Amino acid sequence: MKAIILLFDSLNKNYLPPYGDLLTKAPNFQRLAAHAATFDNSYVGSMPCMPARRELHTGRYNFLHREWGPLEPFDDSMPELLKKAGIYTHLISDHLHYWEDGGGNYHNRYSSWDVVRGQEGDHWKASVGEPPIPEVLRVPQKQTGGGVSGLWRHDWANREYIQQEADFPQTKVFDAGCDFIHKNHAEDNWLLQVETFDPHEPFYTTEEYLSLYDDEWQGPHYDWPRGKVSESEEAIAHIRCRYRALVSMCDRNLGRILDLMDEHDLWRDTMLIVGTDHGFLLGEHGWWAKNQMPYYNEVANNPLFIWDPRSAVCGARRQSLVQMIDWAPTLLDYFQQPILADMQGQPLAKIIASDEPVREGALFGVFSGHVNVTDGRYVYMRAAQPGREHDIANYTLMPIKMNARYDVDELGKLSLAPPFNFTKGLQVLRIPAREKYKGVNSFGHLLFDLRDDPQQQHPIHDEAIEARMINLLIRLMKENDAPAEQYRRLGLDVV
């Protein structure tokens, strides 16, 4: 048995032909959908990048207990479990967060790994002097970082070395993935995880892909949107063209993997999972990107395609709710390994085969933001009560953040907390925290009916439906052994 994961970043399903888009040129995603089950209700869990990857390893939510950070000593790791069972696991990635403080122990769980440098503001190429930066329409406010450490500055330093398609990190990632398949296709018992940061912003690609779209933009350079939309309609259209161009580049590289699946008849004995960690807002709801606003479906409901050689389902749509916490149990089940007790996800074999549901509801969110729940029809977003936005704490035995250590003042306020039901009997550090994305809770509670309002333009007010969704939310939070202050923060009465 073999398996391949292709993991993209910030892939918005509304820009893919299998999900109804008529503008993006992505024939290989169409080709994939014809040879796999396509999921219409695949939701995020813990947001964004590394919290999602922690779910990929552990098969359980983590955003209620801690912000972005490393795997914990008590975390189960699917790639490591497979490795210990004699199944070779290999990671290929250009996802720069793996070599930041808060991601530095994920890749070590694989049998081997290959990293490609240069995406976004990866601190890759040195430039003591100022790199050449053209006039731009708008500098991404949250990305500048200040001084020589800022993502903005480093991204432009890197771009000097990324000019031809062969130079791009995405290309190099898929080169390495193809090399692995060429070398190992006849071997048995392996998992290959190929992941690229694209089509994450900045939307930088070659003219070959940009020329596929009728972009009439005549203004200054602009490929890195952020925050609230303040640009003209022309600028919004320009960004969407650049995003589509980058998706087309992703599509070409997806096709390279599909070609090798055909060439070596890997469809016979190889599971293929193609998905993303989260989506991306491209001006919808008046926002760019993610995190600073409610998790609308453009970010939360993501593309997912799975080929399972056991059921050999091709060209079918699946409506049942699934999440990234299901990927680890699905792969463990596929390789005939036990699914551990602390994993909350479910193996997806039955959904793939016959759309048999595995859950009533899906929990999702980001640490300190809304706690969201969906049953497939309704989405309920529960915000912190006014004045309680900062009533939250990190629970961890790895006191490291995304790209920084905890400072002395923060650690001076820590206390020792009793074990949770997933910490293997270990006590954990409780470190008081604050609302991470300023103002995210100010949107208040939101309830959407996806059947009548799939674009989530008109929140509804229905006490009976809200009460039912609150009960579902509380049940899922209890199953996750959520900290007591989460209920207080959200104004939930729990017996």
Model segments located where?
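Core domains of carbohydrate- and sulfate-ester-processing enzymes
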Residues: 102-152, 194-234, 303, 387-430
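A long, amphipathic alpha-helix that forms part
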Residues: 168-185, 223-272, 334
